[in-house]
Each structure stands twice: as structure tokens, then as C-alpha cells.
């Protein structure tokens, strides 16, 4: 560090120290489920091992989620209509509950939706919700 700004140097060293303790990540290890997780904007992000771009990717997904929710609902609509008989997009969006995103698998899962208590709703996605695949409602 340059001696011209000793206060700044201490600040930077403090940040580096903090990052070392948390392994430089916002992810927290969940022993019960044996994975790492973090939450941004009410969205849970999980992974088995932390890759260097996961935090940035999680932030981008969290920022895009609200905007992409209507497209997610449209994509899930046929399965939801068949399983639960619900066709109103607003009702579906409000019923999905807290999303969980698996960064390793590229899946978006709803474990806490209010359409019933037996099934989980899951789908795969690419990029920042740019394409959707393989939706399923599992019981």
C-alpha cells in the first residue's frame, strides 16, 4: 500500500481481512442441507461449491427476477393449469412464494408456493432467465 494514504490502506486491508474470514463470499454453509446458500431480495441461492462468478450471477438474477416473473409465469402456466386449474397470471405470480435458485443446476424452484402443500414447482433456465426448459410439478 502507498504511504500517501495510510487511512485508505488500513481500510483496504480491513476489507481483505474480512473477506478472508468469510472466504470472500456472501454464501453461508448450511450444514443441514450440505450446501452453500445466500439470499438476495427474498430469493434463495444455493450451490454445492462456490464458483468465482456465482455471486455476480446471483445478483444479476435477483435484479432481473421481478421483471422476468411474468415470463416465468407464462412458461409455467400450462403445467399449473393442468395440475391446479389456475389460469390467472396474477394469482399464479402471487402464489409462487419464495423462489430458490440452484446455481449449479440452473434451476428455479418454488418450495413454498400456496397452490397446494404437496408439490414443488421447478424449471430450468439459461442466462439471466433468457430461456426456460423442462418445467415440472413434482409431488
Predicted regions and their residues:
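Acidic, proline/glycine-rich low-complexity IDRs
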Residues: 5-27, 32, 36-38, 91, ...
Amino acid at each position: 500500500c502507498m504511504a500517501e494514504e495510510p487511512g485508505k490502506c488500513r481500510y483496504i486491508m480491513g476489507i481483505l481481512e474480512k473477506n478472508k474470514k468469510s472466504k470472500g463470499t456472501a454464501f453461508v454453509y448450511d450444514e443441514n442441507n450440505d450446501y452453500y446458500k445466500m439470499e438476495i431480495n427474498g430469493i434463495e441461492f444455493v450451490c454445492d461449491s462456490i464458483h468465482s462468478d456465482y455471486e455476480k450471477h446471483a445478483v444479476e438474477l435477483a435484479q432481473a427476477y421481478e421483471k422476468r416473473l411474468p415470463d416465468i409465469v407464462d412458461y409455467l402456466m400450462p403445467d399449473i393449469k393442468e395440475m391446479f386449474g389456475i389460469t390467472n397470471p396474477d394469482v399464479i405470480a402471487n402464489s409462487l412464494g419464495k423462489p430458490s435458485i440452484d446455481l449449479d443446476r440452473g434451476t428455479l424452484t418454488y418450495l413454498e408456493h400456496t397452490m397446494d402443500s404437496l408439490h414443488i414447482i421447478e424449471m430450468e433456465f439459461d442466462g439471466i432467465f433468457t430461456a426456460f426448459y423442462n418445467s415440472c410439478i413434482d409431488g
